[in-house]
Amino acid sequence: MAIPDGTASRTAGTPKCMPVSNPADCFWQEDATELREHRSSEQLPEYSDIVIVGAGFAGLSTAHHLTRDASISKSICILEARGVCSGATGRNGGHCRPDFYGHIPTYMDRAGARAGAEIAEFEIANLRAIKKVIEQEKIDCDFTLTRSMDVWCNEESAKKAEAVYQRMVSENFEYMDDVVFYTGDKVPGICGVKGAIACASFTAGTMWPFKFLMHLTRQLLAAGINLQTYTPVTSVAADSAGDFIIATPRGKMRAGKVVHASNAYASALLPEYGKNIIPCKGICCRIAVPEGDTAPLLNNSYITRTQDNTLSYFVPRPDGSIVVGGAASVFRPFKDQWYDNVDDSVLIDSAKDYYEDYMQRTYSGWEKSGAKISNIWTGVMGYSYDSNPHIGKVPSKDGQFILAGFNGHGMPVIWLAAKELARMVIQGIQFEETKLPRLFQTSQFRIDLAQNGKEEDGDILGTGKFSTTKP
C-alpha cells in the first residue's frame, strides 16, 4: 500500500527513541500479507476506550486477551509506527525457550529463591499456554515442542554451569526434574557440537512468530478492533476530563486508557524509562545447504557457547535450514553499533561476517554441507537495567500501563504476561492480584534505580552490582 501523509517513523517533532521507517528485510517476513500494512479506517477514530501503542507480540497479545471476555464491551484501537510485527518479534530467532537456570540464580540472589523460581515457573506455563492456543486454533506457525540443548565448550564455564545446575537441584524446584545435565567424554556425541565439555537439555519450543501474530491480527480484526499501521504516536497527554489525547502525524484521538507495548521504544512516550529500557540491536541469520542437498539432521534447538564464550542460539527449521543469532561478545566492544541504537535498517558491522561457515566449524557432520547464509538481518530489543521486564501500571500516571523491556527474552514471557496485564486494565486489579512474577512489576523504585544509578552498574553494560534493597 502507499503510505500517506506523515507516516514515516521519524518526522519533525517526533521523539528520538522511535523506530526507523526502513527496516532491513528479514527471512520471517518474506511472505508478509497485506495485513501487515492494514488500516481499519481512513481516519483515526475519535475515541477508543483502550489504545494500545505497538502491534508486536505484546500489543497484539494484550488485545487478544482483552477481547476474550464476551461480557466486556470496550472499543480498542492499536496504533503501530510501522507494520504489524515489524519489530523484535518479527525479527527474532524463533525460540520459545523458558529460562530454567540461566539467570534464575541472579534473581534468587537479589530477591530470594522463591522470587527466582516464580520466573522459571511462569515461563514454563507460558510455553504450555502458547502450545495450547496453537493446537486449539490450529494456527499454522511451525510450532514444535522439542528439547533445547545448552552447550559449553569452555572448561571454566562448564564447571560454573554444573555448579549452577547442582544449586538449582538442591533447591528442590520441581521443574528441574525436566533438566538433564551431561559431562564427560560422551558430551560431543550427545549434543553434536565440536569440543563440547558439558551440555544440558530441557523442554522448549520453536515457532514462526510472524505467522502466529498474523493469525492473532486476523482474529482481532474480525472482533472489531481498529488497527492503524504506520501511525507513530508522538505524545500522550491527560486532559481535564480524565481521558488521554493521543497525538500522531495523522491527527489526534482520545482514549480512556493507554497500554504502552512498544518494548524498546517505550521511552519515546514515557521518558522516565529512558535509562530503564534501552534499545539494543542484535543479529540473526538463516543458514541453508545448497538447493537439492539434504542438511544433516538436527532435532534440538540450541544455545551454544564456544571455547571463547561466544554465545549463539539457533533453531532447526522444517525445511532443513537453520536460524541462528547471537554473537554479542563479538560486537559488544563496539557500543555505538548496538547500544541505544534503533537503526534496524543496517547490520551490526562488527558481527555481520561471524556466521559465515558457522555450521561447518561448530557442528559435527556439517563440514562438507556447503551451508551458507541465505538471509541476515538485525532487530532492536528492549533491554532493562535490572534484566526484568516492566509490567503493570505506570507509576504516577493513572490509566496508563506498560508491558515492555523483555531483554531479548519476550517469547517465553509475553503471552501470559499480556493476559495478566489485560486483567489489570479491564478489572482494575492490582499487580499483586495477578499471577505475574513479583520481579516483573514496574515501580518508581525500579525507575529511580536506573535513573540515579551508574550505567556501568546495571545489567546491560556493567556488573549488575546495583543496590536492590528498597530504602
Question: Which residue ranges define each predicted feature?
Answer:
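Short hydrophobic core segments
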Residues: 50-53, 79, 233, 246, ...
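Beta1/beta-strand and adjacent pyrophosphate-binding region of the FAD-binding site
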Residues: 41-58, 77
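Active-site lid/adjacent beta-loop-alpha segment flanking the redox-cofactor pocket in flavoenzymes
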Residues: 293-399
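Rossmann-like flavin
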Residues: 107-219
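Glycine-rich FAD pyrophosphate-binding loop
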Residues: 67-91
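Central helical "cap/lid" subdomain
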Residues: 248-299
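C-terminal lid/capping helical subdomain adjacent to the catalytic/cofactor pocket in oxidative enzymes
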Residues: 2-48, 65, 69, 240, ...
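A conserved short coil-to-beta-strand element within the FAD-binding core of flavoproteins
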Residues: 181-190, 225-244
